[in-house]
């Protein structure tokens, strides 16, 4: 597209400057012409007049560079034209890109409300021929373009094997897998090889510290000699060398865990017998290497933080299930050389005991841990190890520590970061209270996820942040068996305050949130659902919202556990969040997510099936490439034997990418059956990808047959249930807003089904009607109310005809009773700036159904209004340049009654008052926020009294229920 900005004054001045510099005969040094006109861009050699390397292209080059004669002035004038045209095209392209970026930034600077977004889509549909034509064309174009991009990326990756597409971590891990099968002594000698590169040049002393640990596990061997002093100097001065060593040392710890798994099955009795003699050297090591580890932490804090953490508190395992140990549990066993025998002995002893309760630490170990923590506190502790948090994936925990240190350094160094404060880990805040927590019912998870390893395990992230999370909050709210009681949440809150031994920034925000003024469980649940809705619309914004309110830990491992454990998250949006290559935090979360998965002894396509069951691998080709790359890295780590079958580990990545293309081609409805990929086509596409060699034909045939029999699918989420409801509704679909239009798609990532019930529509409340007349089936979503009528009943299914739909924003619920309708419900519209009008009247079959439905409806209305209020405040603060503090939304809490209904006057005041908004945004104390909320409170004729207890979401029980 031609851009008018190309003829701007800035572009013209740049062109004139380019022309002047060329006339004067100076060497060109601008960015636009460097790559083409610099002598270094061409090889030395004889030049022929007709070649592209003719002296005509060197008219501006100095004579001393290549000994070329620039020619007479007339020739210079003639040959300057290609240079000027090329510069003009580059500058024009830059101006066009700047204009596109500027237009995008302007369009994204203000976020429209949901109804205006629907209206915007509606106008586009009208412009391009109507809803059906537009959506069909858009779907076809998008599918074709994505398929084209995927094929293009695959060809690029297939033809550029020499680029080493996989990250250096996997390449290094592939080289180091030789050590993991040669013996544990070589593993441990290489484990600290990267850590010898430190500012203090204490590599030899560190090797002396490590040798007793290696001797504990096997016969004494000689460690690798430390690098020469010249290597140390180069490592200090060259950032790239230091980074490569750092990555190498990090990846070696993963290989240690892999080697440890085989050792545990073969040498467990010998290690049990050697536990007694291991204890004393380990205790001596605790006192010796604290100082050395401190010095190393200064240069490699992200490498040694988890080692400090492990030496301060030896891992105390919980009861383990009877199944085989996962990769996370085996990773626990060899985090530090001296701590490994103790863990094995404890785990072995615990397996014999076969207890179902949490294993408490002995008093001596507790006192030892207290003393060690006082003597040597780690620089950064996000979630310190404890009895109830050992079952967390330690690989992910270490990943969060080592990655988070980079964020803390970028925030201003150790002194500037709240988490690096010297008093953040005071000894007085170290009580060990986790075993007192009552065990909660287990949450069923897939066996490969090392999140809740056994039936009664409770991870620390879940125990700390789960009181605002239950199934009624998360997804469809149709299951009420896991709803937490308010009393239990308050008791867990009090225990949680004692459990956390480190004070962090977000923990302080959590303390403020748990104060008595904001301890209302209803509001907490509402804000958690708002965070889920924001995530399902814009994942980064949702994660930030949940972190600010303390629902999710502010670490990559905490966010990874949240994405894998919690319901109510769109798997499509999880893939969007994890596939974001622009933000380092998202990439670290993706690494932690794949670290939670164990692909050992699995075929590549089956491992990819397990990965895609939790994350939807679909969308932009670059995001798909990023997800497949992370999966391939994890698969290489879990299956070193499979990797050694190939000449290059990149082959795993190429093959996984080809499997995704095969699955898309085989099950896409847009591909005709005769054009679907055949087995020979699949094999032909993968010829020579393994450094010129072919992948074994038997392997490719097995992959093709398994994909042909069973599609790679993503597990169901809350969107799946909405899609089922959408398929049951025939006729015109809901419009999704208060504006009349052509309709919209019902199933969206942020939309979830709250409840379904049967009511009777009342055309005129003052006139009686026959019993059972105007029967309506009501589907209540979190932002939409859909009224349908049974269209056709079959033996195993039922279809509904669409009648009406209403947006929940601005809706009010009123109750009425008369001699004709004892359980009347009236829905009115009270959007600020619009007239109040009656939307529809219903009559419930009984008072219980009316109460349940109105409670759910009022809470959903409050959720929508709170989201809109959050959007408006964010936009106003963005326009005014006011930075919203993390708890500014608390100013709106007191404006809401217990059931969550706001009056129209309250909405008008809250949205129109600029000064009040500014004050609430800048309020720094909870008292100010409370008083501001009390001043803005209004009575609502349609709201229930504040003393009415909120009923959690429960499904009503009509004759027909959607599952």
From Swiss-Prot:
Annotated ranges, domain SEC7: 517-710
Domain PH positions: 774-866
Entry superkingdom: Eukaryota
CDD domains on file: PH_IQSEC (cd13318), Sec7 (cd00171)
UniProt-listed GO biological process terms: actin cytoskeleton organization; dendritic spine development; positive regulation of focal adhesion disassembly; positive regulation of keratinocyte migration; regulation of ARF protein signal transduction
Compositional bias annotation for Polar residues: 29-38
Stretches assigned to the IQ domain: 134-163
First-listed, main subcellular location of the protein, grouped into a coarse class: cytoplasm
GO molecular function ontology, one term from the record: guanyl-nucleotide exchange factor activity
Effect of residue 335 to Q: In IDDSSBA; loss of function
Coiled coil: 848-879
Residue positions, PTM Phosphotyrosine: 911
Modified residues (Phosphoserine): 89, 105, 107, 180, 249, 253, 512, 515, 892, 924-925
Tissue expression: Expressed in brain, ovary, heart, lung, liver, kidney and leukocytes. Moderate expression was also detected in lung, skeletal muscle, placenta, small intestine, pancreas, spleen and testis.
Phosphoprotein keyword on record: yes
Entry GO CC: centrosome; cytosol; intracellular membrane-bounded organelle; membrane; nucleoplasm; postsynaptic density; synaptic vesicle
Region (Disordered): 21-88, 312-332, 349-513, 922-947
Subcellular location: Cytoplasm; Nucleus; Postsynaptic density; Cytoplasmic vesicle, Secretory vesicle, Synaptic vesicle
Reported disease: Intellectual developmental disorder with short stature and behavioral abnormalities: An autosomal recessive disorder with onset in infancy and characterized by intellectual disability, developmental delay, short stature, aphasia, and hypotonia. Additional features include seizures and behavioral abnormalities, such as inattention, hyperactivity and aggression.
Subunit structure, interactors included: Interacts with ARF1 and ARF6. Interacts with GRIA2; the interaction is required for ARF6 activation.
Protein name, as recorded: IQ motif and SEC7 domain-containing protein 1
Species, as recorded: Homo sapiens (Human)
Organism ancestry: Eukaryota, Metazoa, Chordata, Craniata, Vertebrata
Gene: IQSEC1
């Amino acid at each position: 597209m031609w851009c008018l900005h190309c003829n701007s004054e800035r572009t013209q001045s740049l062109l004139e400057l380019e022309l002047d510099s060329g006339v004067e005969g100076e060497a060109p040094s601008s960015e636009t012409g460097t790559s083409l006109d610099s002598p270094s861009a061409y090889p030395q050699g004889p030049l022929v007049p007709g070649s592209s390397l003719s002296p005509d292209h060197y008219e501006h080059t100095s004579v001393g560079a290549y000994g070329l004669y620039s020619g007479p002035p007339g020739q210079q004038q003639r040959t300057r034209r290609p240079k000027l045209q090329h510069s003009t095209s580059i500058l024009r392209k830059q101006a066009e890109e700047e204009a596109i970026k500027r237009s995008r930034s302007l369009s994204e600077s203000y976020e429209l409300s949901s109804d205006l977004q629907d209206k915007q889509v509606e106008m586009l549909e009208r412009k391009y021929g109507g809803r059906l034509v537009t959506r069909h064309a858009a779907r076809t174009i998008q599918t074709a373009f994505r398929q084209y991009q995927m094929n293009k990326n695959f060809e690029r990756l297939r033809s550029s094997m020499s680029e080493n597409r996989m990250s250096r971590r996997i390449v290094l891990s592939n080289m180091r897998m030789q050590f993991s099968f040669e013996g544990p002594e070589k593993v441990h000698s290489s484990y600290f090889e990267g850590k010898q590169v430190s500012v203090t040049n204490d590599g030899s002393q560190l090797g002396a510290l490590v040798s007793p640990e290696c001797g504990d596990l096997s016969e004494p061997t000689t460690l690798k000699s430390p690098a020469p002093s010249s290597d140390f100097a180069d490592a200090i001065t060259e950032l790239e060398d230091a980074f490569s060593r750092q990555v190498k040392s990090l990846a070696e710890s993963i290989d240690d865990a892999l080697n440890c798994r085989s050792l545990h099955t073969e040498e467990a009795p010998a290690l049990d017998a050697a536990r007694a003699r291991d204890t004393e050297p380990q205790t001596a090591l605790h006192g010796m290497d604290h100082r050395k580890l401190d010095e190393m932490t200064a240069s490699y804090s992200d490498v040694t933080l988890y080692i400090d953490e492990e030496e301060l508190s030896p891992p105390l395992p919980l009861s383990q299930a009877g199944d085989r140990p996962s990769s996370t549990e085996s990773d626990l066993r060899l985090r530090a050389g001296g701590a490994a025998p103790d863990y094995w002995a404890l785990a072995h002893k615990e397996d014999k005991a076969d207890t179902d309760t949490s294993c408490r630490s002995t008093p001596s170990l507790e006192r030892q841990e207290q003393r060690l923590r006082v003597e040597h506190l780690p620089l950064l502790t996000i979630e310190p190890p404890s009895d109830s948090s050992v079952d967390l994936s330690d690989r992910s925990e270490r990943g969060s520590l080592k990655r988070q240190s980079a964020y803390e350094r970028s925030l201003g160094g150790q002194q500037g970061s709240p988490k690096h404060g010297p008093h953040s880990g005071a000894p007085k805040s170290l009580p060990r209270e986790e075993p007192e927590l009552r065990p909660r019912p287990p949450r069923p998870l897939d066996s490969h996820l090392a999140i809740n390893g056994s039936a009664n395990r409770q991870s620390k992230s879940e125990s700390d942040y789960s009181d605002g999370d239950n199934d009624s909050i998360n997804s469809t709210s149709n299951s009420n068996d896991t709803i937490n009681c308010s009393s239990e949440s308050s008791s867990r809150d009090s225990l949680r305050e004692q459990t956390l031994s480190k004070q962090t920034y977000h923990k302080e925000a959590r303390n403020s949130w748990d104060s008595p003024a904001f301890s209302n469980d209803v509001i907490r649940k509402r804000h958690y659902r708002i965070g889920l809705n924001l995530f399902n619309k814009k994942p980064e914004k949702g994660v930030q919202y949940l972190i600010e309110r303390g629902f999710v830990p502010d670490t990559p491992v905490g966010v990874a556990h949240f994405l894998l454990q919690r319901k109510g998250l769109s798997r499509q949006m999880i893939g969007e969040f994890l596939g974001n290559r622009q933000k380092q935090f998202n990439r670290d979360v993706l690494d932690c997510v794949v670290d939670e998965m164990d692909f050992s002894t699995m075929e590549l396509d089956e491992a990819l099936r397990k990965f895609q069951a939790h994350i939807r691998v679909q969308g932009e080709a670059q995001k798909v490439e990023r997800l497949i790359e992370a999966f391939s890295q994890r698969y290489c780590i879990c299956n070193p034997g499979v990797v050694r079958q190939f000449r290059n580990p990149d082959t795993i990545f190429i093959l996984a990418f080809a499997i995704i293309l095969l699955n898309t081609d085989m099950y896409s409805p847009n591909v005709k059956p005769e054009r679907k990929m055949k087995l020979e086509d699949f094999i032909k596409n993968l010829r020579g990808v393994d450094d010129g060699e072919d992948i074994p034909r038997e392997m490719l045939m097995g992959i093709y047959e398994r994909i042909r029999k069973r599609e790679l699918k993503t597990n169901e989420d809350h969107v799946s249930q909405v899609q089922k409801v959408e398929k049951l509704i025939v006729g015109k679909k809901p419009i999704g807003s208060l504006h009349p239009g052509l309709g919209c798609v019902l199933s969206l990532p942020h939309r979830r089904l709250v409840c379904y019930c049967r009511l009777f529509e009342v055309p005129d409340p003052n006139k009686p009607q026959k019993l059972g007349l105007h029967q309506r089936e009501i589907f209540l979503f979190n932002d939409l109310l859909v009224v349908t009528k049974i269209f056709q009943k079959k033996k195993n299914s039922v279809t509904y005809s669409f009648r009406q739909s209403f947006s929940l924003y601005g809706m009010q619920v009123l109750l009425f009773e008369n001699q004709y309708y004892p359980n009347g419900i009236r829905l009115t519209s009270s959007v600020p700036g619009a007239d109040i009008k009656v939307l529809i009247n219903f009559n419930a079959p009984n008072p219980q159904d009316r109460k349940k439905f109105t409670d759910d409806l009022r809470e959903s209305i409050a959720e929508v209004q709170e989201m809109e209020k959050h959007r408006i405040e964010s936009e106003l603060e963005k326009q005014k340049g006011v930075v919203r503090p993390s708890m500014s939304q608390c100013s709106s809490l007191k404006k809401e009654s217990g059931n969550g209904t706001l009056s129209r006057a309250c909405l008008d005041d809250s949205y129109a008052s600029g000064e009040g908004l500014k004050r609430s945004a800048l309020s720094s104390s909870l008292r100010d926020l409370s008083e501001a909320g009390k001043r803005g409170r209004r009575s609502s004729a349609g709201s229930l009294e504040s003393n009415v207890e909120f009923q959690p979401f429960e499904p009503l029980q009509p004759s027909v229920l959607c599952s």
